[in-house]
Amino acid sequence: MRTIPARWVAITVFISASILNYLDRQILATMADIWRTQHEFAFTYGDYGLLLAVFSIAYAVAALFAGWFVDRVGLNRGAAWAVALWAVASFGTGASHSVGELLVWRALLGVSEAGAIAAVTKAVALYLLPRERAMGQAMSQLGLSLGAGVAPAFAVFFSYRFSWHWAFYAAGILSLAWIPLWLATSRFIPPASQPPAAEGAPQSFSLLADPKLWALMIANMLGMALYSLWANWAPTFLIRVHHLTPPEASHYTWIVPLTGYLGALLGGAISWRLVRSGQTPVAARKRACLIAALLVIATAAVPLLPNPTLATLGMSFSFFWVCAWSVNHYTLPIDIYGASRSGFSVSALVFAYGVMQSSISRPLAAVIERYGFAPICFLFAGLPIAGYLLVHLLVPNRIEGQEFSQSQLVESTPSTCRLSSTS
């Protein structure tokens, strides 16, 4: 008989929403090439870049308000509203018959998924110990990786067996089913830590006057450009560079996001070990980011790999280490600002990611159409180390008033459940 902390059971259920989050989002990456071959309506890589840009603008604009909203109304209401809204967006995408209609629904998806990211961060902050938070973020990456890994086969299955519309309908149905599952779980396993009373918008937005938050935001724009590349363009890389069809590419690209989870898990484990050795959480996250950023430089060689198998391994290696970088970088705001403002502070990073992706999506499409992936991989390979250097210079290793009292709260709470080996 083994004892598993109940807080980890709750986090596992909550983070299962991340699977649906990226399933809804990443179906589009494969569908972009399916639409180009099925000719139901005219669709180009430029249109795909425009969809990514519109999604990202909505994602960025909504992010700061979504973080404040989740901090204000609480975890359960915030998560339920976000998931319900993205299910509606998925249904609308499935019912679309033109690029113009797709733009409307992908914008709504961007708004809703910004709230979902804030909710995941809130759950990690409320349920887990400070030393466990990077591992909690790594579990979130598992959900994102599974969703992104399943998405190519999911899109191909419905598009070639039934209709591409049903890929989005099915994703929406699964999302709606998650809401009662989480509400029931949270009833039986409440968070061990309750933050102070919700702050108003002026108090939350006052964080924008802190230079440390701006350093984290700019670093996120730099480091996560490579994440955006592989999350959105991996199928296109194999189709354009190695001349595969969309179904053939789907046999390879599912591997890339799953290795991202392994990278996030290792990144979380590195900082966990460093914290246990006596380093402050901030210092540990920064050290883990440095290790990952140095290894990501190998991305520059990915376009030189001669066949789809090696190219997939190269993309996977790159994504592995950028996710190790990401999981630690996204945990830094929780370490610095605490659980009570975790939704807003991490949403500031989500805002930065959205601004970055909306800015680069259309230029990326143009460069890919004209020059291929080589110049992009060469440029993006050095961006995570630039992001690390910015944080290293502007964010101190020891933050006054860092929140460590949560560990005492959790340890004094009856927070374990027993799972027998026969269950």
Which ranges hold each PLM region?
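Juxtamembrane intracellular "pre-TM" segments in multi-pass secondary transporters
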Residues: 1-3, 189-217
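A late C-terminal transmembrane helix in Major Facilitator Superfamily
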Residues: 334-370
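Helix-loop-helix hairpin linking two adjacent transmembrane segments in secondary transporters
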Residues: 140-186
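Conserved MFS/SLC helix-loop-helix module at the cytosolic interface between two early adjacent transmembrane helices
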Residues: 61-97
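Extracytoplasmic
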Residues: 9-43, 230-235
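Helix-breaking motifs and short loop linkers at transmembrane-helix boundaries and internal kinks
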Residues: 40, 74, 95-101, 305-306
